[in-house]
Every structure is written in C-alpha cells, then in structure tokens.
From Swiss-Prot:
Annotated Gene3D superfamilies: 1.20.5.3310
Region (Disordered): 47-79
Membrane topology, as annotated: Single-pass membrane protein
Gene that encodes it: tatA
Record family assignment: Belongs to the TatA/E family.
Protein's name in the database: Sec-independent protein translocase protein TatA
Source organism of this protein record: Shewanella piezotolerans (strain WP3 / JCM 13877)
Length: 79
C-alpha cells in the first residue's frame, strides 16, 4: 500500500513524455549514456595505468633481487 505501483509509474512516465517530448528524452538518454561510457573508459584506463605501474615495480624488484644474488655469488667465488 505504501509503495509505488506499476500504474503510478506509468502515469508519471506518461506525464514526463507529455512535458518533454520524445526527442528531448531521447537526447537526454543519449547524453547520459555517453557520460556513463566516458566514466567507464576513464576508470578502466586508470586501472590499466595502475596495473602497469605495479608490474613495472615488480620487474624492478625482481631485477634488483637478481643483481644482489649475482653479486653474492661473485663474492663467494672470490672467497
């Protein structure tokens, strides 16, 4: 009883269509869809950038570890 029924939603939708017209609603929907798509693209490129930075940091750490191991093995060979 306290909730909004389907009939009430249909009446509201009909009033909105009558007030704004279908062309205006279509353009608003397209603009909203474009904004959502742009936001998703921005978020995915940000995540890709972070992933690249993480992988670069891991590679740097691995190369540092490898260099340290080589230095230790040379020290052992000299001793």
């Amino acid at each position: 009883m306290g909730g909004i029924s389907i009939w009430q939603l249909l009446i509201i939708a009909l009033i909105v269509v009558l007030l704004f017209g279908t062309k205006k609603l279509r353009s608003l929907g397209g603009d909203l869809g474009g904004a959502v798509k742009g936001f998703k693209n921005a978020m995915s490129s940000e995540e890709e950038k972070k992933a690249l930075e993480d992988s670069a940091a891991e590679k740097k750490a691995e190369s540092t570890d490898t260099a340290e191991k080589k230095a230790e093995s040379k020290d052992k060979e000299q001793a």
